[in-house]
């Protein structure tokens, strides 16, 4: 199989459009959503490798920072956490894995009207976020997967740092190739990356063996606190600001916890509610099968995918808990569960 044949037919037009568009940009800020996960960091790194191969000036913008457990990924250039003291004034923005401007963070969202922008994402919505072009593919498992297809459409080999970046995105957004989005296309791409030297086992090892003691203590406390609702079909856990302070853990240490709740026997949907600040709570939802947590999140001005979604509730914890669980209950009722 020729590398270009790895691009599925339904993705070919978008990959070719974005590859052509990237040849016409310069002085680019590459950004994704705030508090980036593995797919966001992997997609940004992949974009940086592509832009470097195309001899374009760029820098990565990450807010508030690259999470500690993802810091093993070599980045193509410096990751800036602010738009002050930049190496150049950007003219373009490449927006990745981010369905709406507010999820870029206030600093970049405020600057966005001044820039030409391209948007590549696999979340529903955000189709018009890029002023100069959009490629939104909800059928893709990860935005890093789309960046791999852009690279192939541009005639670039998937090797070295580019391959590792794509591998990170695939591994994290497919749950280590366990989720329902692990399609034949994903497995073909992953196999090609391994053939080209990507250390898939090494990426998994770094992701799975990078816990701090504070994270272990936090998870232990939350495991004791987690509750089952609706006859055991819903798992729920609240996280208060004091929990992070007491254990010395960071917000990023919660990454993956809601997936653990979803693995409880009989659970069809899991909800994690985190107090982010007084009067402001973040929620993460996970589900299996036909349970559409994206619909529950959308009812609360959030978003995501059918089996993984989230959002923000600007209210205190007691009200947020009731609001979130009621929205989830309505979705489960519609499924007859």
Specify the residue positions occupied by each region the protein language model found.
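Hydrophobic helix-and-loop "lid/oligomerization" segment in the mid-to-C-terminal part
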Residues: 2-34, 42-71, 87-90, 172-337
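Generic enzyme active-site microenvironment
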Residues: 31, 35, 95, 119-120, ...
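Short glycine/serine/threonine-rich phosphate/pyrophosphate-binding segments
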Residues: 38-44, 101-105
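Glycine-rich, phosphate-binding/catalytic loops in enzymes
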Residues: 46-48, 110-113, 136, 188
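Hydrophobic/aromatic beta-strand patches that form the interior of the parallel beta-sheet core
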Residues: 61, 92-94, 116-120, 133-136, ...
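Active-site cofactor/cluster-binding pocket
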Residues: 74-131
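A generic local secondary-structure boundary/capping motif
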Residues: 82-84, 105-109, 134-137, 155-157, ...
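Short alpha-helices
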Residues: 122-189
């Amino acid at each position: 199989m020729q590398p270009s044949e790895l691009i599925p037919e339904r993705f070919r037009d978008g990959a070719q459009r974005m590859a052509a568009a990237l040849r016409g940009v310069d002085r680019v800020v590459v950004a994704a959503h705030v508090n980036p996960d593995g797919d966001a960091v992997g997609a940004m790194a992949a974009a940086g490798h592509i832009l470097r191969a195309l001899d374009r000036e760029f820098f990565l913008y990450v807010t508030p920072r690259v999470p500690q457990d993802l810091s093993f990924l070599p980045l193509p250039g410096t990751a800036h956490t602010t738009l002050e003291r930049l190496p150049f004034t950007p003219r373009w923005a490449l927006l990745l894995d981010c369905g709406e401007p507010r999820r870029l963070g206030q600093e970049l969202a405020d600057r966005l009207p001044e820039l030409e922008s391209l948007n590549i994402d696999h979340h529903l919505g955000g189709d018009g976020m890029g002023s100069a072009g959009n490629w939104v593919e909800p059928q893709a498992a990860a935005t890093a997967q789309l960046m791999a297809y852009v690279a192939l459409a541009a005639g670039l080999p998937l090797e070295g740092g580019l391959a590792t970046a794509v591998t990170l995105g695939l591994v994290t957004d497919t749950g280590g190739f366990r989720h329902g989005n692990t399609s034949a296309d994903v497995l073909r791409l992953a196999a090609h990356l391994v053939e080209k030297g990507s250390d898939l086992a090494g990426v998994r090892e770094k992701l799975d063996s990078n816990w701090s003691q504070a994270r272990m203590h936090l998870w232990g406390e939350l495991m004791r606190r987690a509750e089952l609702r609706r006859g055991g079909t819903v798992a729920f856990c609240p996280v208060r600001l004091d929990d992070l302070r007491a254990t010395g853990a960071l917000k990023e240490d919660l990454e993956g916890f809601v997936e653990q709740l979803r693995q409880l026997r009989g659970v069809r949907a899991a909800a994690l509610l985190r107090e982010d600040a007084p009067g402001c709570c973040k929620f993460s939802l996970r589900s299996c099968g036909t349970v559409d947590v994206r619909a529950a999140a959308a009812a609360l001005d959030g978003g995501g995918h059918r089996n993984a979604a989230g959002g923000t509730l600007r209210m205190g914890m007691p009200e947020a808990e009731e609001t979130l669980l009621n929205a989830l209950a309505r979705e489960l009722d519609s499924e007859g569960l």
